[in-house]
């Protein structure tokens, strides 16, 4: 099945991902699954499976910045979708594009980096 969404990553996201991949070896596969089971369900098929939450204060008519809270990580056995890994991304309505902005582990960082999101929006 081909994706209807084009995916991109910020350099900061790539650093986050690389750092977490050392700790959680299944992240690459887990992210691919999240693209289909969460992002495409929510934005394309309009199915809300309660894993994605828009971040207030960062949504416009053109961009919706969201947080994936329910992210299943196989490397964290027994935790299922409550892995504690969070992904912040921006969905661009006009060209059906997702840019991954941030990935973090809740055990190391409490919340998203709002300044990073602000900078992303300013540069979009």
Set out the residue ranges of the language-model regions.
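Short conserved beta-strand segments at catalytic cores or DNA/RNA-binding microdomains
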Residues: 88-92
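Short, surface-exposed coil-to-beta transition loops
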Residues: 82-87
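Basic, Lys/Arg-enriched alpha-helical interface segments
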Residues: 1-81, 94-98, 106-124
């Amino acid at each position: 099945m081909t994706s209807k969404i084009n995916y991109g990553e910020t350099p900061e996201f790539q650093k986050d991902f690389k750092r977490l991949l050392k700790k959680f070896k299944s992240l690459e596969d887990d992210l691919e699954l999240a693209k289909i089971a969460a992002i495409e369900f929510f934005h394309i098929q309009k199915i809300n499976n309660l894993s994605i939450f828009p971040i207030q204060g960062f949504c416009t008519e053109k961009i919706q910045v969201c947080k994936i809270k329910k992210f299943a990580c196989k490397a964290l056995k027994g935790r299922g979708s409550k892995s504690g890994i969070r992904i912040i991304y921006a969905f661009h309505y006009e060209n059906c594009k997702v840019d991954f902005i941030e990935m973090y582990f809740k055990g190391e960082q409490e919340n998203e980096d709002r300044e990073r999101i602000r900078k992303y929006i300013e540069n979009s």
